[in-house]
């Protein structure tokens, strides 16, 4: 599995700001979208382009545009919504496919509860967004679902990942690409990433 820990100074600075214990909901939400946008930039760097001729201000001009499969952004509810706008900022024509997963706090296993995908999933590249890759369960289950619906090209974008989650995702889906702002130290006994960001969903939605 291709794993990219984005080392760009802007990414490292912004993810550092998100670790503050007293960060406001507004600021956390803004930074989640900003880092999501920067991860999208990295994840789409290998998109193929083609040369076309358009009518410019002073006659015909050759330009490059993206070709091939179109994109669907797949936020994993609810926290993934915090990164969605960052993706759409770069790819405003992307379709939105929503998957609802929550983690059972006792078993730490993902529980699906909602699904609404683009109708043409086999012809789209899926960018799955979720702030945290902890145990990897929610991401793995979401990718299982996308593959069942015919999606063959999938990239996962997460703000922070635990080594345990990276390993689990690699075992389950070695063909997927992972882009993250940081691979952190470990998971604690409650399944939270250390040092991590805390509960990203609560911080994005102001329910902490």
Swiss-Prot record:
UniProt keyword annotations, A-Z: Allosteric enzyme, Glycosyltransferase, GTP-binding, Magnesium, Nucleotide-binding, Transferase
One of the protein's GO biological processes: UMP salvage
Presence of keyword Magnesium: yes
Positions with a binding annotation for 5-phospho-alpha-D-ribose 1-diphosphate: 78, 103, 130-138, 199
Pfam families in UniProt: UPRTase
Pathway: Pyrimidine metabolism; UMP biosynthesis via salvage pathway; UMP from uracil: step 1/1
Domain of life: Bacteria
Identification of the protein by name: Uracil phosphoribosyltransferase
Principal EC category: transferase
InterPro entries: PRibTrfase_dom, PRTase-like, Upp_B, UPRTase/APRTase, Ura_phspho_trans
NCBIfam families named among the record's database cross-references: PRK00129.1, upp
Family: Belongs to the UPRTase family.
UniProt cofactor(s): Mg(2+)
Enzyme Commission number(s): 2.4.2.9
Classification via SUPFAM superfamilies: PRTase-like
Binding site for uracil: 193, 198-200
Gene Ontology MF terms in the entry: GTP binding; magnesium ion binding; uracil phosphoribosyltransferase activity
Function of the molecule: Catalyzes the conversion of uracil and 5-phospho-alpha-D-ribose 1-diphosphate (PRPP) to UMP and diphosphate.
Cofactor note: Binds 1 Mg(2+) ion per subunit. The magnesium is bound as Mg-PRPP.
Ways its activity is controlled: Allosterically activated by GTP.
Catalytic reaction annotation: UMP + diphosphate = 5-phospho-alpha-D-ribose 1-diphosphate + uracil
Cysteine disulfide partners in this protein: none
């Amino acid at each position: 599995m291709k794993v990219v820990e984005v080392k760009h100074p802007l990414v490292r600075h912004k993810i550092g700001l998100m670790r503050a214990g007293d960060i406001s909901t507004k600021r956390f939400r803004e930074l989640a979208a900003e880092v999501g946008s920067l991860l999208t930039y990295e994840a789409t760097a290998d998109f193929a382009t083609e040369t076309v001729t358009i009518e410019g201000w002073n006659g015909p001009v050759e330009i490059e545009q993206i070709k091939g499969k179109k994109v669907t952004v797949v936020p994993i509810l609810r926290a993934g919504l915090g990164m969605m706008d960052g993706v759409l900022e770069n790819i405003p024509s992307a379709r939105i496919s929503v998957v609802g997963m929550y983690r059972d706090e006792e078993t730490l296993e993902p529980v699906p509860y909602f699904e609404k995908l683009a109708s043409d999933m086999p012809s789209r590249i899926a960018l799955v967004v979720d702030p945290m890759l902890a145990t990897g369960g929610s991401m793995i289950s979401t990718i299982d679902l996308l593959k069942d619906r015919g999606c063959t090209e999938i990239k996962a974008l997460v703000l922070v990942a635990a080594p345990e989650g990276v390993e689990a995702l690699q075992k389950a889906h070695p063909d997927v690409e992972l882009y993250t702002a940081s691979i952190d130290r470990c998971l604690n006994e409650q399944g939270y990433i250390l040092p991590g960001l805390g509960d990203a969903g609560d911080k994005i939605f102001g329910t902490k």
